[in-house]
Amino acid sequence: LPFDVHLMIQNPKRYIEDFCKAGADIISFHVEAEEDVTGTIEKIVACGAKPALAVKPNTSVETVFPYLDKLYMVLVMTVEPGFGGQKYMADMMPKVGQLKQKAPHLLVQVDGGIGVDTIASSAKAGVDICVAGTSVFRASCPKQMIADLKKAAKDV
């Protein structure tokens, strides 16, 4: 399984080498958190990982357009970053559509509020990867929740 790291920190470029040494395969960082976006992407690639940019709900998806040809993936946040258990923001799905239209080769990931009742709308929008935290870890049977999530996404 790929080790996918989502850095929710300021100046992520400073920490790239440490995460690569720890075995990260994919490293996502917030476009809003780094002045040297291109340099950070290049550093991720140089250490052998795949670069990804994350976009907060209030940030225009067009902010990542200049970097699409250098990226493996874009992470569209479907909650405000910071804590688990927030409500899924379905109004982020147009960002997914814009990304798929502009760069069909790119993987699109969503993170935030993913559950059995929200994963289908993400799948319909064209999302490739859904991050499910609270719905899995607070479930009475996490294994069953994962199976239910997979089924709900496939039934689209």
Over which residues does each language-model region extend?
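Active-site beta-loop-alpha junctions enriched in small/polar residues
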Residues: 8-12, 32, 56-58, 79, ...
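Hydrophobic faces of well-ordered beta-strands that scaffold small-molecule active sites
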Residues: 3-7, 27-29, 51-55, 74-76, ...
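Glycine-rich phosphate-binding active-site loops on the catalytic face of alpha/beta enzymes
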Residues: 27-35, 75-85, 125-145
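Conserved, mostly hydrophobic/aromatic
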Residues: 19, 74, 99, 111, ...
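Catalytic cores of alpha/beta
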Residues: 13-21, 59-71, 114-130
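C-terminal helical cap(s) of enzyme catalytic domains, especially alpha/beta-barrels
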Residues: 44, 123, 137-156
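Glycine/Thr-rich beta-alpha phosphate-binding loop at enzyme active sites
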Residues: 57, 63-103, 107, 118, ...
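Glycine/small-residue-rich loop that forms an oxyanion/phosphate-binding "nest" at active or ligand-binding sites
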Residues: 1-53
